[in-house]
């Protein structure tokens, strides 16, 4: 909300994939609480459920989906800052970015610049799925390797062996377990024709 107020946004859209019903429920509850406390006007925050297409992570495809169309990226120009949602100027933020801005404001820049690993500074949220003991989002130094990430996720489940991993989304490729010492970051993975 601070980001929305800072740019004098007329409306806030929160786009959440439908695969996360528990998160959608929490968001509905929190939005309702904000409205009841008159912190925001009813309808100021519009929670939109997405169909879950990976491409909707791209800002213009997400806007298309919010508008009820197929989530396909738009041609540029114009950019969404000029012609975005419902043809209005639009500022798109990732929730993780907003999380870090708030945390840096509360705790100072040291929260990020005091952590360094494998030549990378800061912290990063890693989303872990598969046959690990504790799948979910894990906060680790930005230069973490897949070995570090699996360890943070409680290790492999009993009876399962680590064979390969996908360091990013569907377009990132799959790396063998033998490449477990590479930091999971764009700069390090680029040399292996994949990305995070």
Q: Where are the language model's segments positioned?
A:
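Short internal beta-strands
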Residues: 11-18, 166
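Accessory "access/gating" subregions that flank catalytic or transport cores
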Residues: 139, 166-177, 181-184
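Conserved adenylation A10 loop of the ANL superfamily
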Residues: 149, 187
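Short, structural beta-strand-to-alpha-helix junction motif
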Residues: 141-148, 194
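Histidine-anchored nucleotide/phosphate-binding helix
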Residues: 1-5
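Single conserved hydrophobic/aromatic residue that forms the stacking wall/gate
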Residues: 188-195
């Amino acid at each position: 909300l601070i980001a929305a107020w800072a740019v004098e946004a007329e409306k806030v859209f929160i786009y959440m994939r439908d695969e996360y019903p528990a998160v959608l429920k929490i968001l509905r509850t929190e939005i309702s609480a904000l409205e009841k406390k008159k912190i925001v006007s009813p309808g100021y925050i519009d929670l939109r459920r997405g169909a879950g297409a990976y491409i909707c992570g791209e800002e213009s495809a997400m806007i298309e989906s919010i508008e009820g169309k197929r989530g396909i990226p738009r041609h540029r120009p114009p950019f969404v800052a000029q012609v975005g949602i419902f043809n209005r100027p639009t500022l798109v933020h990732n929730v993780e970015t907003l999380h870090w801005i708030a945390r840096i404001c509360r705790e100072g820049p040291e929260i990020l610049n005091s952590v360094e690993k494998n030549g990378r500074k800061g912290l990063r949220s890693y989303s872990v799925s598969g046959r690990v003991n504790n799948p979910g989002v894990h906060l680790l130094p930005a230069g973490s390797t897949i070995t570090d990430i699996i360890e943070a996720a409680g290790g492999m489940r009993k009876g399962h062996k680590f064979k390969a991993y996908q360091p990013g989304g569907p377009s990132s490729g799959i790396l063998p377990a033998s490449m477990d010492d590479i930091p999971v970051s764009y700069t390090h993975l680029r040399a292996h024709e994949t990305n995070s």
